[in-house]
Amino acid sequence: VVLEPSAGTGLMAILAQIAGGSLILNELAETRADLLSSLFPANPVTRFDAAQIDDHLASGAVPSVVLMNPPFSVMANVTGRMADAAYRHVASALNRLAPGGRLVAITGANFGPDVPAWRDAFTRLQERGRVTFTAAVDGAVYAPHGTSIDTRLTVIDKLPVED
């Protein structure tokens, strides 16, 4: 079972579906949620704020994989930038993830365990899982999709952390 908490237009969800995953789709924005409902008619689309996805999904919705590209600095119902928006989304999705599951996140390039401003946040995340991979990704990779923002790919396995 694959959860995409901020599913957007389904670019990652379709890959999970092609790979055989059953989908849990969530998208707060009405237009994108309607598009997802059209593209994935067999899957209900919820419209929760993904920063609190763990609090809102049905108790039986427990994914073994989370694929996410959360907002980098935008929060629902908040005016202005929120520096910890990506962290809130990742933390809530990690809470929802099944033990032994894997979370894969595309975030802003500066959201990483080696960045001093995020070290404490990643220490807290590692109480629930271990970061098994993280790497910056040059924004040019995304040019075909209309953006060139530098990002980071981070993989967190929900396994006990080794001391």
Describe each PLM feature range:
Residues 1-77, 86-88, 95, 100, ...:
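Conserved S-adenosyl-L-methionine
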Residues 80-155:
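Conserved Class I SAM-dependent methyltransferase catalytic core
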